[in-house]
Amino acid sequence: MCIRDSYHFQLTASHSDSPTFKVKAVPELDGAGETLRLNTEAYGGMIDYTWFDRPLALAGRVLVREGDRIESRLLATEREVAIIPSLAIHMNRGVNEGFAPNRAVDLCPLISAGDLKQGDFDALIADELDVEPEQILGRDLFLVNRQDARIWGWADEFISTPKLDDLACAYTSLQAFLGAENAHDVSVFCCFDNEEVGSETKQGAMSTFLADALRRINGSLGFDDESYHRALAASMLVSCDNAHAVHPNHAEKCDARNQVVLNGGIVIKEAANQHYCTDAFSRAVFQAICDDADVPTQAFANKSDMAGGSTLGNLSNMQASMHAVDVGLPQLAMHSSYETGGVRDVMYAIRALTAFYERNLTINGAESVEL
C-alpha cells in the first residue's frame, strides 16, 4: 500500500449474529416423566415456529480456569443434542387456526429422555472440552440449526441455509475485501456482533469499536488527529444487511413499486426516517459503481403503512460519521431458522463490493465525487 499525503477509508459493515436461543446460567429444567429440558431465552426476533422439530446443536464459548489463567474455549458440538418438539394436533386442535408459542413453555428444548439429571449439563460441556466441570466459570452457548445449506430449484437458482441474514453479506463482503486491489487507500472489512439485539454492546455497531480501530490505523500511518477527521469526511461505508424480497404469496406486504426479487441484483435500501443511511449522494456513488461493474441493482423502501427495521450504517455513524449507503441481498423468510435467497445475488454482491473496494473515490464534501 502506498498512502499519499491524504487518504480515506473504504469500508463494508455486516453482522455475524442471527436470532436463536441462548442457554441460561442455570441450564436445566425438569420435564414431564423423566425428561430433562434446557433452560433458554430468545436471542433476537426470531420466527418462533420455525424452530420446532429440528434437531439442534450447541455452539459458543466457554470460559475455563487453568491454574492462574482464565481461557476462552470455542465449542461447537458435532452432533445434535436438543430438539423443541411440537404438541401433537390431537392435543392442540386449534394449532392451524393461529398458535402463538409461549417461549417459557412451548419452546423449551428437550435434551434427555431420562439419562441426564439436574447438574449434568456442565459435565457434558466439560467432556466436550476435555476439562473438569469445576473449571467452567462462564459460558455463552446458543442453539444452532446444523441443517446443511442447499442450492436447489429446477435451474439451481435458490440457496437455503440457516443464518443467511447476515452471513450472506458477511461472506460476500469478505470475499470482496480479500480479492480487491487498492494501493492508495485503506480498505476495511467490519463485521459487528449483536445487531439482532440492538447493537448496544462493546462489539456492536453503536460502540466505539470501529472508530477506535480507524483512529489507531490513522496513527499507525503517521497521521495526526486532524488528518483522521479529514479522512472520515472523505470516506464511504457500505452497510451490508439483507433485504426482504417480495413474498410470492404476500405481495401486499411490500411497497407497490419499491419491491425487490430474488436474483434481481443487489438491493439499495432507503427510508425517510433515516433508519437506513442511504441518501441521494451515497446512492448515486454506489449506483455508478454497480453500473460500471455491470451489476444490476434494486430499490427497496418499506411499505408506508408498515414499520421497518434499522441496521448497521446509521448506528455506526453515531461514532464515526462518514458517507454511507445501506445495501443487501434479497431474501425470503428473514429470521426463520432456515432462510432462502438467490444464488445469482451472491455473485452480484461479490462483484459490486469488489468494485467498490477497488475504486479510488475522491469525495469533495457532499457536492461531488471523482470515481
Report each predicted region and the residues it spans.
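N-terminal hydrophobic/helix-forming segments and targeting peptides
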Residues: 4-371
